[in-house]
């Protein structure tokens, strides 16, 4: 072998060595390379540290596929490659190399874990004049054989011709074809080491002839085998393959599957008529076989469902009221009214079961109970208290989320004729837990929808009706299934969006939300210990004082429940855990508002607070939403004008009508209120409810609007320490409204301790927690003049009785 040296390269510094497994690179090739081994990564990093664009590396193949390359395990001839692109992924690198020249490494040295080598460029031997003709003939032969080889491999012929035609010189042609040819590493390395272009092309042509012969032989063998296999032999062969595949996948043949299904049906203790129907379909399955009909798989899936449903499996009820009370208290703080209602419900079931003399009477005693509806804001414990009921009864628990359900098939399932048909969610849950008498929570029934696919709310009517659900027929099953022993509990946030026929089947239990004191205790006893555990903290590593918990409740949450409170405590625990894990602190004690602010940032919530002083035209009202109750300041302003009346604040129609009723009342009784009669004619009146981006509606702002309006007209300031609510009529009568508990709790949270309510709402005060009720003073009014006297600090406002309306007389 002859070597030709150029003088330029020996002057180059030694290059880092990139060892390649099962890859030989040739000059003129640009190719991506994935680097992941430690030594190769070090070599690439050493090459990349070179200043400027001279980021070159010596790429050489390994003699074997060893994981840790050594100097003795590398060939001596490789290529000098320039690194053109680098992309990191995970712990490795993706490179694009352009191979510039062939080179030899007389020796390898390893310094600081990087293999380096002084490289000497190896140029191709110069061509002799007599070699030109032979080289041209060889080039044509290599091009033709390369196209033929690629065609056998499945590549398009036009693409192959374009590829080989783009090679300008013999050296470029032989290097590219040798790189892409499927040859063992030693044979490719031998091609790289040949410096004579003619010799290298002759060797490549021999390799191409040999590879083409191998491929043609493989094709002949395949054709001969396919011809020798007749139709019968082919069928036998395929069936044997199918059995082998089924065995590997753990599947059964038809007869074994049918026998297994028959055994399951016998053990399922099915009712007689259902067992008869199942056996009839099982006989059909045996006759058709799985391969002969697409219906066979549908039948098999249906029979699996019939056999797996718990037709007679149930759990025994253990109604122990003391244990039930202990479980409810253990899982939930507060909610006294709800717990009492649940215990009453369980007590009735206990007495009914004790009086039942037969299995039929026992079943009727279980099925005749009411359907409880837990109604209240998010995060107040509706779903979790249903789970506690299941624990108290010793029953299994299933939750079915119906939020956004718009298809009747969610309840009744799809008919078997549809592709991918499945039973409804009710039967899916019952099959999953394996009991016919679980506690099933139908979550978010107020968010059911309806579409062209049916109304799931209408489908629930049968499910929740004790007179019908003992024979509930799912569309997929097509057989009656007894749901009468299931204890259904529904949850919802809004009463108004539940379909009236569905609501009529339920008995609501109201979850009004928690007071700040209740939230404080829930955070201390339940939420904080849970978040400590989830973050891997011991009790002494994270302590949160009562003051800090109160600050979190008021400054970082605004809700009737405790869901956001738990998330905020979780964020607090995670930030403390990070500091402890980093070694910055040994334990965290959150004791003041500054500590909370340091960990959680500034407070995100701004609760409405009572006004600091009395002022005309501003009255404090109360409202409630699904997030709980709060206060609002209704503003009234009187200005020179033409008697126009303006209402702003994105008010609904009902609130606008309340404002107009208040204005009409003020005009009718201007003299008694001390308002000059001409003032209303020469003044414009503007009533505004702040937070204009939030839509508002409802009748309960009538009293507040009237007080603010009369205050603005008369110039008398409204007491800032009193909050009010109630609907008004044109005669000045104050009518009762709803949401008293939530509104009063919101006012109490805002620091207001005097509440004005309609007298007809007096009974609603019994729903208030004792600690809240004892700290407030209530004023119950029947008429608007009583409200004005109380809110404007007047002794009384005496209004004349309205004139009696004339009676209609029959002619």
Curated annotation (Swiss-Prot):
Residues 15-212 form the Lon N-terminal domain. It catalyses: Hydrolysis of proteins in presence of ATP. One of its GO terms (cellular component) is cytoplasm. SUPFAM superfamilies: P-loop containing nucleoside triphosphate hydrolases, PUA domain-like, Ribosomal protein S5 domain 2-like. ATP binds at residues 376-383. Its main location: cytoplasm. It is found in: Cytoplasm. Induction: By heat shock. The keyword tRNA processing does not apply. GO terms for molecular function: ATP binding; ATP hydrolysis activity; ATP-dependent peptidase activity; sequence-specific DNA binding; serine-type endopeptidase activity. Keywords: ATP-binding, Cytoplasm, Hydrolase, Nucleotide-binding, Protease, Serine protease, Stress response. Homohexamer. Organized in a ring with a central cavity. Belongs to the peptidase S16 family. ATP-dependent serine protease that mediates the selective degradation of mutant and abnormal proteins as well as certain short-lived regulatory proteins. Required for cellular homeostasis and for survival from DNA damage and developmental changes induced by stress. Degrades polypeptides processively to yield small peptide fragments that are 5 to 10 amino acids long. Binds to DNA in a double-stranded, site-specific manner. HAMAP family: lon_bact (MF_01973). This is Lon protease 1. The gene is lon1.
